[in-house]
C-alpha cells in the first residue's frame, strides 16, 4: 500500500455528500462539513472536522470539494486561511452560525423568527454566490457588499449574537491593528446603525435601508430611467415628453426627455431601440422631501387634425395634437423606500384625451386624481435611484450611464453649483392665450410658433430645444387645440444661446390658425404676434415668473420685420383692461397695432451662472464700467439675496479680489472688500448654503489668483483684533472671527501664490506679520472687558480651523508656541468648556501629529483636563466631562497612530497626570452614567499604550508606600467592578476582549509590584493581596472568557485572536499564592470560595495547576490547628452554589480526587483526613451534579429524588441552612405537581428543628423568604398552619388532626389563647367529619425498575415503589414514565433482569402494579373500627408491598386447577413508608416466597369472607344502595349451579390422600375449615338483609337462593361445626350515634385474628348483637352530636374486585409516650437527629419519641407513620398523661345505660381471640383486657 504523504495545496475542503464511516478509522461526514486535510493516500484523505478538531479520521477524496487556501506561519504554527474574498468567508461563517440557531428556533416552535432567519439565510446564500462569481460591476459589487454586511449585522442583532465592527469599506476591523479608541467608536457607530435599521424594519417604511441611508446622506441625486417599450394604438407618429412632476404644486420640475415614436410601434430612429435611457439629474434633498413626485409622460400625436378623418390626402398633416398622458407615482423610489433595481420593469398606464379640445395639463390632473383604467396601454420602464451628480454617477455606474445616456437637468439650479458648471439656460413655458374669432364663424385652432430672433429680425438657428435627447431647432410649433378660444398649452422649451448674444436677442411668438383641410391651411397666415426681450435695459435678465405679453395684429409680413414691432410695447400695461374697447388701439406703428381683445402669457425661468437679475450685484460684477459707484455697490452687496450671491460666487469673488489688487497701493477699499468677503463667507457658513463650502474650497484652490491679497487681509484682520482688544467698538469682528477659517485660507493661498511667483521672497516679513497677528489674537484672549467675552468664545471655537492652512506656510513649532500662549493667557477657571472643545480641535489637526508640537501643547492640555476632571461631579459639570473625555479620546487616538518611539514621553505625561484621575472618575461615576463607557475606554487605552517601562516609572512616582497601596487598591476594586458589571453592551465582544487583554497585562504588572514591595512580613498588606486574589478570580470566571459556552465559530475566533486568558491569570494566581508563605493562613477560609470557583472552570490544564492550592490550604490550616475544619466547611458551603450555578463536572470530581490524593504522598500525617475529605466532597459533588443534571429536566420526579439526596447529605453533615434551603426547593416542586401530602411532610421536617419557645430563630433555621426576625414559636405555628392546609388538600386528615392537637395543647396550656383554641377545635371537628363522610380513593402502587447504564446514577439498576395519584391507572402512569425517557425500552416481564441488561448501555424500564401490605397493630386489633377509618390505613403508612403471580407445579387436574396452582410472591420493602416526602421510595429489600395451593385457598377464603362482611356493613349503613351487587355475591357462593367456592377446596385438600402426603399441613387444613365454617353465619346475615330489601319481582330468585343456603348450611355445619354471630337487636334505643355499630364491627385485623380451630365455642349469647343496629349513612350532625371518644359513622365505600389490600398502622412505644416530664433535646441534637424517622412523632421534642430516632444516616428520609398520639387512641392507663393524650378512643361515660351490652360485645371479641390458632395467638393488650 502507498504511504501517506503530507498535502501541500489540498488543505481545505467541504463535504459535498454524506459519508457514513463503516470502520473505526473513518470520519463520518455530512454535507457542508468543513474539513482540514492533513495527509493523502490514493483515493483517501486524512484530516479532521473544523468545527470539532477531535473528530479525526480518513474519508474519500471524491466526497470533498477542495477550496483554495493561503498558509500563514506564526511561531511555527500554520494558520490556514481560505483564499476567498473576506466577505464571502464571513458569509460562510455566518450561515454556519445562523444554521444551528435556525434549527433551535424550529425545535422551540418560534415560527415567525424561524421563517425570518430562513429568509435572511436564503438572501445571504444568493449574495454569496454573486460575490464569488466575480462578474459584478464595481458599483454593483459595492452595493452588494453593503447589503450583505447590513443583513449580517441586522441578523446578528436580532439573534443576540456578537456585534461585528467594520471599517468604511465593510471589512471587519482587526483589534490588533486598531486602537482601543477607534474600536470603541466603531462599536458605537455600528450599534447606532443597527438600532436605526431595526427601527426601519419595525416601521416597514424603509425596506431597502442601504439605499435609503445613502440617498439621505448625499446632497445630490439622480434618477435613471430606461424606456423599454411603449404600447399604444395611435396609427401616426408621436412625441413622448417624459418629466418629473410635483402634483401638489402642479409644476414640472425637470426638463422634458423627448422620445419620438413611429407610427408602426417602434422608435422613429430604429437605432434608439433598447437604448432609450435618460438620467434626471440635479435632484437635491429638497426634491426628495417633496410630498409626492410623479414620473409623467405627455403624448403628442403628429398628423391630422382629426384622427378619424378617412381622406388623409385632403387633410392637413404634421399638426401637433394632444393624445394622452401616462402617470406613475415614484415617490418611494425617489426616497429610497421602494425597491430600486434597474432590472425590475414598471408599467405606467396610458390615459387618452376624452375630447379633441382636452388640455394635456388638465388631463394630467384628472388622471392623478382618478387613476382610471388604461386598457393595457402604456409605458414599460425600469428605474434606479443613483447617488451623486452627473460626474459622480458616470464614474460609479458606467454600465448604466454612458455617452449615449441622455441627461435631463432640473428646472432650476442644483443645491450645489460647482465651479466650472457654466450654464445659461432660459426655460420658456407657453402658458395660455385668449383669442377673439373676429370675422370667423368658429373659434380658431391656434398654433404658436416660437423662435429666437436677433435685433434685426433674423432667426437664430438651433436656439430652441424641445426636450433632452432631441436636436436643437430653429422654431417651435405648439400643440393645436381644436376650436378653443382660451387654449392652455403649459408647454416648456429651453432657449440656449451664447452669453454674448443675450443683449441683442428677443423671443418672437407667431399665432396662426390651422385648418383641418390642407387646401385651406395653405392660405392661412399669421394673424397676430407677441415678442419679449431677454435682457432689460439695466443689463439684468428677464425676471423669473409670469409675463403677460402684448398681442400685436396687422400685416403678417410686417410681423417678421423687427424694426416694425420692436418699437411697440412688449408687456401689457398692468392697468390695461382686456375688454375695454374694440376701437382702434392708440399704439400702432407701421401696420402693426396692439390688440385689446387678445391675450397671451408665458412664464420664464433663467438658469444662468453668468446672468443676474439683481442690479446691485450686476453693478459690482461690472464695477469697471462705473468705478464711481464702487463704494456704493460694495456696501449694497450685503443686502443682495444670498441665493443670487452664491449663484455667482466665483464672479463675485473675482470682482472683490480684482478691486483689491487694482488698488494695491491704496487702502481705500480694503475694509469694504474685507467686509464684503466676510459677508460672503458668512453666507456659506449659513446652513442653507452649507453645501457651497466645496465651491468656495474649489475656488480658493483652482481660481483664486490675488498674490498680494494676504497683506491687506492680515492688516485689516489685525486692525479689527487690536481695536476689539482695547474694548473699543468693532461691529464686524464677531462675523470676522466666524469667517476666520476662510480668511486664513485666502491669506495662505495668496502667500503661497506670491511665494511661487517670487520664489519665497518676503518670507521673514510674512512670518513676522503672522506672529504679530497671533499675538493680537492672544491679546484679545487676555482682555478683561465684558464686551470681549463673546469674542473670546468665538476665537476659541474658530482658531483651530486655521491651523491646517497656516502650518503650510508657517513654522509648526513656532505656531505651537503661539497656541500654547493662546491657551495659557486665559484665566484658569474661565471658559473651561470652550477651552477643552478648542483643544480637541487642535488635537485633531495635523499640527498635533508632529512630535515637537506635542511636546509644547500636551502639558497645557493635560493640565486643563486634570483640573476639569477633578472638579466635583454635578449637573453643572456634566457637559465639561463629555468634552474632557472626547479630548482625551482624541489625544490617545493620535498617539496610537504614531510610532512608539515618538510618543513615549507623551504617554508618560498622560499616565502621570491623568491615569489616576481617570480611574477615580470611573470609580465615582455611576454604571448607568451616559459617559461611563467612554471613560472606561479612555482608561483602557492609556493602559494599552503604556509600555513596561511606563509601568515601572509610574510606580516610582508615588511618594509613600501607603499612597501606592491606595492606588493599587483603587485599581483592583475598579477592575473587579468593571469585570462584574461590564459597561459595554453584551454583544460588544471585541471591545470586551480587548479590555480583558489590557486588564490582564495591568494586573500582572501590578502583581509584580506587590511581590517587590508588599510581600515581606513587615510590609505585608493583607487587604491588598486579598483584593488581588478576588480580582484575579473575578477575571478568570467572567462570562466573556468561558469559551466552552460559545458557538464553535466564536470559540475559534477568540482562541485564535486572544488565546485562553484564563490559563495565564490562573497560573499567575497559583504563583502568587505560593509566594505568600506564612501569610497563607490569613486567606483561609476567605479565599476558599474564590479558588474553588476558579478550579471549577472546565479547562484541564488550569485545573491541574490550581487544584493543588486546596491541598496547600488544608496543609496550612492543619499545621496551625491540627485539622482543616474551616476549609472543609467553606468548601461544602461554596460547592453547592457553584455547582448549582452550572460549574463542575465528572472530570472535575475525578481530577480533584486524584490530585489531592497524589499530594498526600509527601504528607502521610494528613493523608487520612484528606482521604475522608475527598470522600465527603466526592459524595456531595455526585449528588449536586445529579441535581443539576435534572434541574432543566421536564421530569420533576428526578428533581425531587436528587433534592432528597442532598437533604440527607446536609443533614448528616450538620448543614442546617443548606438543609432548609433544599427542603423548600422540594416543597415547591411538590406544590408545582399538586403533591400536597408530600409538601406537608417535607415542611414538617423544618418544624422538627424548632421548639415551642420564645427564643429568637437563628438565621439558618429561618423560613425561606422570611426576612423579619421570628421566634421559634411563631415560625413553628406558622409552619403548622401551612402544613395543616397542605394535609387538608391532600385529604390526609389524620395527620392534620395530629398537628391540630399539638397546636391546641399550646393554645390551651402555654399561651392561653382560647379564641385560637376554639378555631382549632372547630377545624379538628371538620377533619373528623371529613374522614367519615368524604370518599377517599385508594391509590395504586407501582414497582418501577430502571435497568441499564443509560440511566443517571441515582436511578441506575434500582427499583422504586411509586404511589399513584387519584384514579391513576398503570397504563397512564407507564406512559407518563416512558415520556420522561423517550429512548428507554419497556420490559414486558416482571421478573428481575440479569446482568446483561443491567450492564447494557441502554435504558430499560420495568413497571407493574404491586399491593400494599397492611401492618397489624394492637390499636385496631379486635376493635369495631368503621371501614372509613380502616380503609385509609390499607393504602397509607405502608412500607411493605407484594406482587403475586400464579405458577403450575406437579400434576394438573383439569377439573380442579386449584390443587396445582402455587403462588410466587415477591415482597418489597421500601426505605421509608408511603406517603412521605416523596411519592416514591427505593426498594431496600426484596424477597420471594412461594405460597402453596392450600395457603392460597386460605387467603382466598379470608378475602371472600371479608368481602361478604364489608358488603353487609355497607347495606346496613346505607339503605339506598341497589341490591344487585349483594344478590350476585351471595348467589355466586350458595347456588350449586354457580358455586365453585369451597367445594373445590374439599376435593383438593380434604382427602385422606392429601392428609397422608402432607402431614405438616394439618393446622392449615383446620384453619381453612374454620374459615369455611365462619362463612355460613356471614352468608346468613347477608341473606337476611337481602330478604328485607328484595323486590317482589326478584322474590323467586331470593327464595331459590335461600333454599340453596339452607342446604349449604346443613352440609357445612355437619362437617365443620356451627359458628354463630351475636345478634344486634334493640341497640338503637338510647345509644349515642357514635357508638352504633353494624356487622362491620370486626375489622380486617380482627377477622384475620379469627384463625381458630374447630374447638371454637359454637354459641355466644344471642342478645349481644343486633342486625338492625347500623345507622344510616349520613345522618345530620345537628341531630346527633359527636362525643369526644366516638367514631363517625361509615360512608359508602365500594370494594375493588381485583385485589385485596391490607392496612398497617405503626405506633410509637406507648409507655415511652407517657413520659411527659422528660427534657427536650438541645437545638444541635434536634438538628442532628434523623429526619428519616421510621415512626412519626407528633411531639418530636419528647425523649420517648426521639429515642426511636436513628442517628445513623440512611439513604432517604422516611415518612413518619401515625403514632399513638396522632391517632389519639391511647390506652386507658394513659388518661392522666399530657392533655394532648388525655382522650381515649372508646371512653364511655359512667352514666351509660348500655354498659352491660358493651361488655357482652367485648366478651364476643374475647371469644374470637381464644379461637386463634396457636402460631397466630398473641398476648391480649393490657388495655383490652382491662376493658373486657
Curated annotation (Swiss-Prot):
Modified residues (N6-acetyllysine): 304, 738
Gene Ontology molecular function terms on file: GTPase activator activity; guanyl-nucleotide exchange factor activity; T cell receptor binding
Region (Disordered) residue spans: 1652-1703
Modification Phosphoserine, positions: 588, 593, 1683, 1704, 1729, 1782
Segments forming domain DOCKER: 1210-1621
Matching InterPro entries: ARM-type_fold, C2_DOCK-type_domain, C2_domain_sf, DHR2_DOCK2, DOCK, DOCK_C_lobe_A, DOCK_C_lobe_C, DOCK_N
Expression by tissue: Specifically expressed in hematopoietic cells.
Tree of life domain: Eukaryota
Residues of the C2 DOCK-type domain: 423-607
Signal peptide, first to last residue: none
GO cellular component labels: cytoplasm; cytoskeleton; endomembrane system; membrane
Membrane topology qualifier: Peripheral membrane protein
Subcellular location: Endomembrane system; Cytoplasm, Cytoskeleton
The SH3 domain, residue ranges: 8-69
Keywords, alphabetical: Acetylation, Cytoplasm, Cytoskeleton, Guanine-nucleotide releasing factor, Membrane, Phosphoprotein, SH3 domain
Any Gene Ontology biological process: positive thymic T cell selection
Function noted in UniProt: Involved in cytoskeletal rearrangements required for lymphocyte migration in response of chemokines. Activates RAC1 and RAC2, but not CDC42, by functioning as a guanine nucleotide exchange factor (GEF), which exchanges bound GDP for free GTP. May also participate in IL2 transcriptional activation via the activation of RAC2.
Family per similarity comment: Belongs to the DOCK family.
Subunit structure: Homodimer. Interacts with RAC1 and RAC2. Interacts with CRKL and VAV. Interacts with CD3Z.
Domain comment in the entry: The DOCKER domain probably mediates the GEF activity.
Listed name of the protein: Dedicator of cytokinesis protein 2
Amino acid at each position: 500500500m502507498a504511504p501517506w504523504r503530507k498535502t501541500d495545496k489540498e488543505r481545505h475542503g467541504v463535504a459535498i455528500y454524506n459519508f457514513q464511516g463503516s470502520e473505526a478509522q473513518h470520519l463520518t461526514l455530512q454535507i457542508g462539513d468543513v474539513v482540514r486535510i492533513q495527509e493523502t493516500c490514493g483515493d483517501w484523505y486524512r484530516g479532521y472536522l473544523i468545527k470539532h478538531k477531535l473528530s479525526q479520521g480518513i474519508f474519500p477524496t471524491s466526497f470533498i470539494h477542495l477550496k483554495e487556501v493561503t498558509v500563514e506561519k506564526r511561531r511555527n504554527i500554520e494558520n490556514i486561511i481560505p483564499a476567498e474574498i473576506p466577505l464571502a468567508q464571513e458569509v460562510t461563517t455566518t450561515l454556519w452560525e445562523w444554521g444551528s440557531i435556525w434549527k433551535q428556533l424550529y425545535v422551540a416552535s418560534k415560527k415567525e423568527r424561524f421563517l425570518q432567519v430562513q429568509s435572511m439565510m436564503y438572501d445571504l446564500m444568493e449574495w454569496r454566490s454573486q460575490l464569488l462569481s466575480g462578474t459584478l460591476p464595481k458599483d454593483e459589487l459595492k452595493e452588494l457588499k453593503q447589503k450583505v454586511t447590513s443583513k449580517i449585522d441586522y441578523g446578528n442583532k436580532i439573534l443576540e449574537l456578537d456585534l461585528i465592527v467594520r471599517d468604511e469599506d465593510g471589512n471587519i476591523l482587526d483589534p490588533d491593528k486598531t486602537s482601543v479608541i477607534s474600536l470603541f467608536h466603531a462599536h458605537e457607530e455600528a450599534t447606532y446603525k443597527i438600532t436605526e435599521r431595526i427601527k426601519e424594519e419595525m416601521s416597514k417604511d424603509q425596506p431597502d435601508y442601504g439605499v435609503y441611508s445613502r440617498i439621505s446622506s448625499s446632497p445630490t441625486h439622480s434618477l435613471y430611467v430606461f424606456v423599454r417599450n411603449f404600447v399604444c394604438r395611435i396609427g401616426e407618429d408621436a412625441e413622448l415628453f417624459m418629466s418629473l412632476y410635483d402634483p401638489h404644486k402642479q409644476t414640472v420640475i425637470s426638463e422634458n426627455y423627448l422620445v419620438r415614436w413611429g407610427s408602426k410601434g417602434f422608435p422613429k430612429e430604429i437605432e434608439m431601440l433598447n437604448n432609450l435611457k435618460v438620467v434626471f439629474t440635479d435632484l437635491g434633498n429638497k426634491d426628495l422631501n417633496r410630498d409626492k413626485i410623479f414620473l409623467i409622460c405627455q403624448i403628442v400625436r403628429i398628423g391630422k387634425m382629426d384622427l378619424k378623418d378617412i381622406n388623409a390626402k385632403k387633410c392637413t398633416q404634421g399638426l401637433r395634437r394632444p393624445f394622452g398622458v401616462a402617470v406613475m407615482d415614484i415617490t418611494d423610489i425617489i426616497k429610497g423606500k421602494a425597491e430600486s433595481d434597474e432590472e425590475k420593469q414598471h408599467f405606467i398606464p396610458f390615459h387618452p384625451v376624452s375630447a379633441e379640445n382636452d388640455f394635456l395639463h388638465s388631463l394630467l390632473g384628472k388622471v392623478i386624481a382618478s387613476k382610471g383604467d388604461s386598457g393595457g396601454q402604456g409605458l414599460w420602464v425600469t428605474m434606479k435611484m443613483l447617488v451623486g451628480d452627473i460626474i459622480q454617477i458616470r464614474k460609479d455606474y458606467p454600465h448604466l450611464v454612458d455617452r449615449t445616456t441622455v441627461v435631463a437637468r432640473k428646472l432650476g439650479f442644483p443645491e450645489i453649483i460647482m465651479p466650472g458648471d457654466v450654464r445659461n439656460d432660459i426655460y420658456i413655458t407657453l402658458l395660455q392665450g385668449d383669442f377673439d374669432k373676429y370675422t370667423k364663424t368658429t373659434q380658431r385652432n391656434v398654433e404658436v410658433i416660437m423662435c429666437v430672433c436677433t435685433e434685426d429680425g433674423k432667426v437664430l438657428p438651433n436656439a430652441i430645444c424641445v426636450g433632452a435627447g432631441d436636436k436643437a431647432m430653429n422654431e417651435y410649433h405648439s400643440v393645436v387645440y381644436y376650436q378653443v378660444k382660451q387654449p392652455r398649452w403649459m408647454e416648456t422649451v429651453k432657449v440656449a444661446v451664447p452669453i454674448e448674444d443675450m443683449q441683442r436677442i428677443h423671443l418672437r411668438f407667431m399665432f396662426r390658425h390651422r385648418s383641418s383641410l390642407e387646401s385651406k391651411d395653405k392660405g392661412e397666415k399669421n394673424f397676430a404676434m407677441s415678442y419679449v426681450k431677454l435682457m432689460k435695459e439695466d443689463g439684468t435678465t428677464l425676471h423669473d415668473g409670469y409675463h403677460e405679453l402684448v398681442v400685436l395684429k396687422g400685416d403678417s409680413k410686417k410681423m417678421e420685420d423687427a424694426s416694425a414691432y420692436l418699437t411697440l410695447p412688449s408687456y401689457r400695461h398692468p392697468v390695461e383692461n382686456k375688454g375695454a374697447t374694440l376701437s382702434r388701439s392708440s399704439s400702432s406703428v407701421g401696420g402693426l397695432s396692439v390688440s385689446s381683445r387678445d391675450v397671451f402669457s408665458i412664464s420664464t425661468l433663467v438658469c444662468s451662472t453668468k446672468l443676474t437679475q439683481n442690479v446691485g450685484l450686476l453693478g459690482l460684477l461690472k464695477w469697471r464700467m462705473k468705478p464711481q459707484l464702487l463704494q456704493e455697490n460694495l456696501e449694497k452687496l450685503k443686502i443682495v439675496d444670498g441665493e443670487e450671491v452664491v449663484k455667482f460666487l466665483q464672479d463675485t469673488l473675482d470682482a472683490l479680489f480684482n478691486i483689491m489688487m487694482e488698488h494695491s497701493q491704496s487702502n481705500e477699499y480694503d475694509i469694504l472688500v474685507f467686509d464684503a468677503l466676510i459677508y460672503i463667507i458668512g453666507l456659506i457658513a449659513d446652513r442653507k448654503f452649507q453645501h457651497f463650502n466645496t465651491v468656495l474650497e474649489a475656488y480658493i484652490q483652482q481660481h483664486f489668483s490675488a498674490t498680494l491679497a494676504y497683506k491687506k487681509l492680515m492688516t485689516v484682520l489685525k486692525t479689527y483684533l487690536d481695536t476689539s482688544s482695547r474694548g473699543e467698538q468693532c461691529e464686524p469682528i464677531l462675523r470676522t472671527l466666524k469667517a476666520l477659517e476662510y480668511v486664513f485660507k485666502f491669506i495662505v493661498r495668496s502667500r503661497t501664490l506670491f511665494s511661487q511667483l517670487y520664489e519665497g521672497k518676503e518670507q521673514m516679513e510674512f512670518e513676522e506679520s503672522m506672529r504679530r497677528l497671533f499675538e493680537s489674537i492672544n491679546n484679545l484672549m487676555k482682555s478683561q472687558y465684558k464686551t470681549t467675552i463673546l469674542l473670546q468664545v468665538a476665537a476659541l471655537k474658530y482658531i483651530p480651523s486655521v491651523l491646517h492652512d497656516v502650518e503650510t506656510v508657517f513654522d509648526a513649532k513656532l505656531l505651537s508656541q503661539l497656541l500654547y500662549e493662546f491657551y495659557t493667557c486665559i484665566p484658569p477657571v474661565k471658559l473651561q468648556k470652550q477651552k477643552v472643545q478648542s483643544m480637541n480641535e487642535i488635537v485633531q489637526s495635523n499640527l498635533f501629529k508632529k512630535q515637537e508640537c506635542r511636546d509644547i501643547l500636551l502639558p497645557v492640555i493635560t493640565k486643563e483636563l486634570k483640573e476639569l476632571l477633578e472638579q466635583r461631579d454635578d449637573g453643572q459639570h456634566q457637559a465639561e466631562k463629555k468634552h474632557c473625555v472626547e479630548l482625551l479620546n482624541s489625544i490617545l487616538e493620535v498617539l496610537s497612530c504614531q510610532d512608539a518611539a515618538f510618543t513615549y514621553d507623551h504617554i508618560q505625561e498622560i499616565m502621570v497626570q491623568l491615569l489616576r484621575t481617570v480611574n477615580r472618575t470611573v470609580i465615582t461615576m455611576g454604571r448607568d452614567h451616559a459617559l461611563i463607557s467612554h471613560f472606561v475606554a479612555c482608561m483602557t487605552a492609556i493602559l494599552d499604550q503604556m509600555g513596561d517601562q511606563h509601568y515601572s516609572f509610574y510606580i516610582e512616582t508615588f511618594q509613600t508606600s501607603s499612597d501606592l497601596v491606595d492606588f493599587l487598591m483603587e485599581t483592583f476594586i475598579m477592575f473587579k467592578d468593571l469585570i462584574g458589571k461590564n459597561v459595554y453592551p453584551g454583544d460588544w465582544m471585541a471591545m470586551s476582549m480587548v479590555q480583558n487583554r489590557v486588564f490582564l497585562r495591568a494586573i500582572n504588572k501590578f502583581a509584580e509590584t506587590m511581590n517587590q514591595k508588599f510581600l515581606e512580613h513587615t510590609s505585608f498588606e493583607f487587604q491588598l493581596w486579598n483584593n488581588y486574589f478576588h480580582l484575579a478570580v473575578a477575571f478568570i470566571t467572567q462570562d466573556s472568557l468561558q469559551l466552552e459556552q460559545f458557538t464553535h465559530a466564536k470559540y475559534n475566533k477568540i482562541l485564535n485572536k486572544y488565546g485562553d486568558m484564563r490559563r495565564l491569570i490562573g497560573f499567575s494566581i497559583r504563583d502568587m499564592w505560593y509566594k505568600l508563605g506564612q501569610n497563607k493562613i490569613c486567606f483561609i477560609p476567605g479565599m476558599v470560595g474564590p479558588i474553588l470557583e476558579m478550579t471549577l472552570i472546565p479547562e484541564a490544564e488550569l485545573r491541574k495547576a490550581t487544584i493543588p492550592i486546596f491541598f496547600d490550604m488544608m496543609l496550612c490550616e492543619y499545621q496551625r490547628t491540627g485539622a482543616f475544619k474551616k476549609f472543609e466547611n467553606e468548601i461544602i458551603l461554596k460547592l453547592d452554589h457553584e455547582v448549582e450555578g452550572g460549574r463542575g463536572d465528572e472530570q472535575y470530581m475525578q481530577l480533584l480526587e486524584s490530585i489531592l490524593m497524589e499530594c498526600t504522598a509527601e504528607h502521610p500525617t494528613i493523608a487520612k483526613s484528606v482521604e475522608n475529605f475527598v470522600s465527603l466532597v466526592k459524595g456531595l459533588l455526585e449528588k449536586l451534579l445529579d441535581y443539576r443534571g435534572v434541574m432543566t429536566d421536564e421530569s420533576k420526579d428526578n428533581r425531587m429524588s436528587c433534592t432528597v439526596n442532598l437533604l440527607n447529605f446536609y443533614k448528616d453533615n450538620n448543614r442546617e441552612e443548606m438543609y432548609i434551603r433544599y427542603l423548600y426547593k422540594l416543597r415547591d416542586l411538590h406544590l408545582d405537581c399538586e403533591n400536597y401530602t408530600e409538601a406537608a411532610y417535607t415542611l414538617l421536617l423544618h418544624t422538627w428543628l424548632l421548639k415551642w419557645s420564645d427564643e429568637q430563630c437563628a438565621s439558618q433555621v429561618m423560613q425561606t423568604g422570611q426576612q423579619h426576625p421570628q421566634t421559634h414559636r411563631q415560625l413553628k405555628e406558622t409552619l403548622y398552619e401551612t402544613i395543616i392546609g397542605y394535609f387538608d388538600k391532600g385529604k390526609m386528615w389524620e395527620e392534620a388532626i395530629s398537628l391540630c392537637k399539638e397546636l391546641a395543647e399550646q393554645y390551651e396550656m402555654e399561651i392561653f389563647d382560647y379564641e385560637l383554641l376554639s378555631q382549632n377545635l372547630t377545624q379538628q371537628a371538620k377533619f373528623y367529619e371529613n374522614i367519615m363522610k368524604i370518599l377517599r380513593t385508594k391509590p395504586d402502587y407501582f414497582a418501577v425498575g430502571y435497568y441499564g447504564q443509560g440511566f443517571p446514577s441515582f436511578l441506575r439498576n434500582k427499583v422504586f415503589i411509586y404511589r399513584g395519584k387519584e384514579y391513576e391507572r398503570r397504563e397512564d402512569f407507564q406512559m407518563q414514565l416512558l415520556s420522561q425517557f423517550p429512548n428507554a425500552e419497556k420490559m414486558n416481564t416482571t421478573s428481575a433482569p440479569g446482568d446483561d441488561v443491567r450492564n447494557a448501555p441502554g435504558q430499560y424500564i420495568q413497571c407493574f402494579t404491586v399491593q400494599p401490605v397492611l401492618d397489624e397493630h394492637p390499636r385496631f386489633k379486635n376493635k369495631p373500627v368503621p371501614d372509613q377509618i380502616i380503609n385509609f390505613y390499607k393504602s397509607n403508612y405502608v412500607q411493605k408491598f407484594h406482587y403475586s403471580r400464579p405458577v403450575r407445579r406437579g400434576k394438573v387436574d383439569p377439573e380442579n386447577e386449584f390443587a396445582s396452582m402455587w403462588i410466587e410472591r415477591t415482597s418489597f420493602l421500601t426505605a421509608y413508608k408511603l406517603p412521605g416526602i416523596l411519592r416514591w421510595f427505593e426498594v431496600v429489600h426484596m424477597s420471594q416466597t412461594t405460597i402453596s395451593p392450600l395457603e392460597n385457598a386460605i387467603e382466598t377464603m379470608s378475602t371472600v369472607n371479608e368481602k361478604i362482611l364489608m358488603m353487609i356493613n355497607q347495606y346496613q349503613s346505607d339503605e339506598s344502595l341497589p341490591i344487585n351487587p349483594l344478590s350476585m355475591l351471595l348467589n355466586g357462593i350458595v347456588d350449586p349451579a354457580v358455586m365453585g367456592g369451597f367445594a373445590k377446596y374439599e376435593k383438593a385438600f380434604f382427602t385422606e390422600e392429601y392428609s397422608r402426603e402432607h402431614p405438616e399441613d394439618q393446622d392449615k387444613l383446620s384453619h381453612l375449615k374454620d374459615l369455611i365454617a365462619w362463612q355460613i353465619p356471614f352468608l346468613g346475615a347477608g341473606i337476611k338483609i337481602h330478604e328485607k330489601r328484595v323486590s317482589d319481582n326478584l322474590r323467586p330468585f331470593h327464595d331459590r337462593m335461600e333454599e340453596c343456603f339452607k342446604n349449604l348450611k346443613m352440609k357445612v355445619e355437619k362437617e365443620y361445626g356451627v359458628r354463630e354471630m351475636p345478634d344486634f337487636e334493640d341497640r338503637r334505643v338510647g345509644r349515642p350515634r357514635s357508638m352504633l355499630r353494624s356487622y362491620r364491627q370486626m375489622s380486617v385485623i380482627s377477622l384475620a385474628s379469627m384463625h381458630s380451630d374447630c374447638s371454637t365455642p359454637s354459641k355466644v349469647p344471642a342478645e349481644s348483637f343486633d342486625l338492625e343496629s347500623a345507622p344510616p349513612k349520613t345522618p345530620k350532625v345537628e341531630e346527633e352530636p359527636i362525643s369526644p371518644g366516638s367514631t363517625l359513622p361509615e360512608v359508602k365505600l365500594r370494594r375493588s374486585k381485583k385485589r385485596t389490600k391490607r392496612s398497617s398502622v405503626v405506633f410509637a412505644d406507648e409507655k415511652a409516650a407517657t413520659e411527659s416530664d422528660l427534657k427536650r433535646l438541645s437545638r444541635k441534637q434536634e438538628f442532628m437527629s434523623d429526619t428519616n424517622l421510621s415512626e412519626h412523632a407528633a411531639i418530636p421534642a419528647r425523649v420517648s419519641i426521639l429515642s426511636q430516632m436513628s442517628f445513623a444516616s440512611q439513604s432517604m428520609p422516611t415518612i413518619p407513620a401515625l403514632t399513638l398520639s396522632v391517632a389519639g387512641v391511647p390506652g386507658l392507663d394513659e388518661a392522666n398523661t399530657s392533655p394532648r393524650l388525655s382522650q381515649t378512643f372508646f371512653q364511655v361515660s359512667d352514666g351509660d345505660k348500655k354498659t352491660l351490652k358493651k361488655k357482652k360485645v367485648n366478651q364476643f371479641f374475647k371469644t374470637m381471640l381464644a379461637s386463634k390458632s396457636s402460631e397466630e395467638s398473641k398476648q391480649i393488650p393490657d388495655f383490652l383486657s382491662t376493658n373486657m
